[in-house]
Amino acid sequence: MINFETKDIMLLYSLVNMKLRDEFLDLNDLVNYYGVDKNELLNRFNKAGYKYMESENQFKRV
């Protein structure tokens, strides 16, 4: 199981982008599958300097 709250942000970044690319249509599908709060996940990535790019279905450095 993925610990979205405490996993190292770089590992989480890599893992989430891989899951988005290979297994999920979009971020909503991913958070629903794992039972994760979307806003909390977005905030965690935003604090680390990443933003979800809906058009590319991945997080990118901003």
Map each language-model feature to its residues.
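Short acidic, Pro/Gly- and aromatic-enriched capping/linker segments at domain boundaries
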Residues: 36-50
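N-terminal acidic leader/helix
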Residues: 1-26
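Short alpha-helical "recognition helix" segments of helix-turn-helix
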Residues: 30-31
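Short, acidic, Ser/Thr-enriched surface-loop or helix-capping motifs
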Residues: 54
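A signal for specific C-terminal beta-sheet/loop modules enriched in small/flexible residues
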Residues: 10, 61-62
